[in-house]
């Protein structure tokens, strides 16, 4: 499953890039060839990019736990969500591998909706919150540094 995992990561990274750049949901869910070599993606991952998660809505039945199915569950929730909380609840209520799918959803939705969209009680109950905030601050500072061409 390693080649599929790598392709899913490539696709997700392109989507996350779009979200961090402030793009709308349609642009996030369909990143263009400037960010991704679409033709090189394995067929199951290309179907995700083409919106298979819209046609194959995740169910509460037992999943195969494959990376493509997890990505589809997260993207389906993101596509339908109106806020951060609603999408998280949709993913966790699927039951199978919901922790992983919710983590994937949370990255994308957090980048799209912003930190203040995450319910305060959830943010305040994070374990090692200080370490997470410090690390996020360092990542942001690093991203803001001008890089030589």
Predicted region positions:
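Catalytic phosphate/nucleotide-handling subdomain of diverse soluble enzymes
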Residues: 1-14, 69, 73-149
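Accessory "access/gating" subregions that flank catalytic or transport cores
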Residues: 17-95, 140-147
């Amino acid at each position: 499953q390693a080649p599929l995992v790598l392709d899913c990561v490539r696709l997700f990274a392109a989507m996350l890039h779009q979200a961090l750049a402030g793009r709308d949901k349609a642009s996030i869910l369909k990143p263009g060839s400037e960010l991704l070599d679409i033709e090189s993606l394995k067929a199951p991952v290309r179907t995700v990019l083409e919106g298979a998660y819209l046609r194959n809505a995740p169910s509460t039945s037992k999943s195969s736990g494959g990376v493509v199915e997890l990505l589809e569950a997260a993207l389906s929730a993101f596509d339908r969500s109106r806020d951060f909380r609603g999408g998280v609840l949709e993913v966790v209520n699927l039951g199978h591998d919901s922790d992983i799918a919710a983590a994937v959803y949370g990255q994308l939705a957090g980048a799209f909706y912003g930190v203040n969209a995450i319910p305060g009680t959830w943010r305040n109950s994070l374990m090692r919150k200080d370490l997470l905030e410090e690390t996020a601050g360092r990542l942001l500072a690093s991203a803001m540094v001008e890089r030589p061409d």
